[in-house]
Curated annotation (Swiss-Prot):
Similarity section: Belongs to the DXR family.
Species assigned in the record: Ruegeria sp. (strain TM1040) (Silicibacter sp.)
UniProt binding sites for Mn(2+): D152, E154, E223
Binding of NADPH, residues: T15, G16, S17, I18, G41, N43, N126, E128, G207
Catalytic activity: 2-C-methyl-D-erythritol 4-phosphate + NADP(+) = 1-deoxy-D-xylulose 5-phosphate + NADPH + H(+)
Cofactor: Mg(2+); Mn(2+)
Record-level Gene Ontology MF annotations: 1-deoxy-D-xylulose-5-phosphate reductoisomerase activity; manganese ion binding; NADPH binding
Record key words, sorted: Isoprene biosynthesis, Manganese, Metal-binding, NADP, Oxidoreductase
Gene name, Swiss-Prot/TrEMBL: dxr
Descriptive protein name: 1-deoxy-D-xylulose 5-phosphate reductoisomerase
Length: 395
């Protein structure tokens, strides 16, 4: 338009919290973007509305059973409708400059890999991809001249703090955690924490699963592993600090003693906008911090008794191989059981640990080569292992 090239983009996970925040930014500059594909889950009505408004080429629902509903909602719009995992991978192969990967869970891995194989810039909000197959993703990006930009607020903060720096000069990386909904609860009370209580976050507006993962610190455990995979630092160089205000997102310590921090309001549009506009910084509709009004920033060390997920993350990083895929699969399934009311809040950690141990006891499984097929297999086996433990406990 008038000599300005529109940026071709796709958003996978468009109906979730990250996807909707991305669309909010796109909506503010519609002439700058040509939307190729949008994908979503059960919220077919929202997916169709957004696809029509943004004039996407194709809209994909993850669920085959919802395809006819999506087709009906898109009738006469000119937007193609599709469903299922294969359609997602096909959409990822379509020419694009930038793809947002915000699908929750291991389902985001295959389309993410396909996008990187096309040389597309991948804005990665799907932390499970890096946890399950970080080496595979990073190698695929390198092989095809593609770039991965982090969208987690913590990893975006680290990425920004490292601009102009050399990773070998980094002494430590500190990612912060709000502490979640139960940060000030007595430990004993956590045994009876309800689904509704775990689904409420004090600072961030997020989806239910990630909010529960925040309360249990499984979200932070994934982010610790993600930090290792993305930035290539040793496990012992990664620290977590509980920071209740969620204003300092990460800090990078260098060998000269300097500590670089990134501050911003708890609004995911910061990290999304940075990835969308990188290497430029465009204006964003987010709150500006008034440090004088804030007055003080609070930090404290995490209690590993309260947050056993952080201990498990260190064990997974030391173990290496496909243990990240096993950890994530077991964690996801344990979360399913908590949401379904079959187990208590604290049972998620012990279940995940048991599922992980079951797979690690199988000779050669965790040390198998890192391929998409092996990652998918280990993820499936971890989920089944957790199901078996739940059946034994409740049966």
């Amino acid at each position: 338009m008038h000599g300005v090239t529109m940026k071709k983009i796709s958003i996978f996970g468009a109906t979730g919290s990250i996807g909707q925040s991305t669309i909010d930014l796109i909506r503010r500059a519609p002439d700058a973007y040509d939307v190729v594909a949008l994908s979503g889950g059960h919220n077919v009505a929202q997916l169709a509305r957004d696809a029509i408004e943004l004039q996407a080429d194709i809209a994909i629902t993850a669920h085959d059973a919802r395809l006819e509903e999506l087709r009906s909602a898109l009738a006469g719009s000119g937007v193609e409708a599709a469903s299922g995992a294969a359609a997602l991978v096909e959409a990822a192969s379509r020419p694009a400059d930038w793809i947002m990967s915000a699908i929750v869970g291991a389902a985001g891995l295959a389309p993410g890999l396909k996008a990187l194989e096309q040389g597309t810039t991948l804005a990665l909000a799907n932390k499970e991809s890096l946890v399950c197959a970080g080496a595979l993703l990073m190698q695929t990006a390198a092989d095809h001249g593609a770039r991965i930009l982090p969208v987690d607020s913590e990893h975006s903060a680290v990425f920004q703090a490292l601009v102009g720096e050399r990773i070998e000069e980094v002494e430590r990386i500190i990612i912060t955690a709000s502490g979640g909904a139960f940060r000030d609860w007595p430990l004993e009370r956590l045994k009876t924490a309800s689904l509704a209580e775990a689904s409420s976050h004090p600072n961030w507006d997020m989806g239910q699963r990630i909010t529960i993962d925040s309360a249990s610190m499984f979200n932070k455990a994934l982010e610790v592993i993600e930090t290792r995979e993305f930035f290539g630092v040793a496990p012992e160089q990664i620290e977590v600090l509980v920071h209740p205000q969620s204003l300092v997102h990460a800090l990078v310590g260098f060998r000269d003693g300097a500590l670089m921090s990134h501050l911003g309001a708890p609004d995911m549009r910061h990290a999304i906008g940075y990835a969308l506009h990188w290497p430029d910084r465009n204006a964003l509709p987010v709150a500006r911090l008034d440090l004088a009004a804030i007055g003080q920033l609070e930090f404290r060390a995490p209690d590993l008794q309260r947050y056993p997920a952080l201990r498990l993350a260190q064990e997974v990083m030391r173990r290496g191989g496909l243990s990240g895929a096993a950890f994530n699969g077991a964690k996801e399934r344990a979360l399913d059981h908590f949401i379904a009311g079959r187990i208590g809040f604290l049972d998620m950690a012990s279940l995940t640990e048991e599922g992980l141990a079951t797979l690690e006891a199988q000779p050669g499984l965790i040390d198998a080569s890192m391929t998409l097929e092996n990652v998918t297999r280990v993820d499936d086996l971890a989920r089944r292992a957790v199901d078996q433990v739940v059946t034994q406990r409740t049966g």
